[in-house]
Amino acid sequence: SHSTLDDLEYYIDLSKKADIPFIIDTEGSQIRTGDLSSDSYHFKENDKILLYKKKIIGDGKRISIRPSQILEQLKEGDILYVDFDTLVLRINDISNISNGFIESTVISSGYLGKNKGIVIDPQISRRFDMPTLSNKDIEAIKIGLKNNISLVAASFIRNSNAVNYVRKISNGKMKIISKIECLDALENLDEIIRESDYLLIDRGDLSKEIPIEKIPFTQKIILNRANNQDTDVFVATNLLES
């Protein structure tokens, strides 16, 4: 998910030479910042940032957001947490969505980098329509199939339909590791376990959607549910920090 398609085959070749199993890790249905003309930009409180649907090279005044359809679902007042709360934005003007952009205001200063995850305020009860796989993910899976890669870690899986879609795209030739890292996944946990080959608990991303003090308890619930269905689980990220 953090590599380019051009780099992917190179990394696959390295893993084969080292005789290490390789896993295709998808971006999944996560909102991310686009490319920037610099490694990062610093924004102060009350700065304005234009958020664009189309792919642009961002700068100190405007950035692109993907998937593009998410901008059409945002409303004025919505809060966006960028890169583990490094930067916090509030949507303040959506009147230009027909022109391909909306306006946000910085409410907590910080740095913005390229390809960084964005979380919409979990207190917002609306459900957002997000693709299970990005176009880049689909191409990465094709490269994996061509190179006989047998594992795909599917990020931000939200329900069993998403698992089945990944299985369809991989032609049923890859074992699916469903990553549990959002509220929807917790609500649909049993059906996700049923359709998956393995689970992965992403404690870091999950802590952006539920209070961090609930992570150990939630982790235990997921492990118990998976054990009940004889499904193996990876426990990943932010282990040493707690």
List PLM regions with ranges:
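Non-catalytic helical/linker scaffolds that mediate oligomerization, partner binding
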Residues: S1-S242
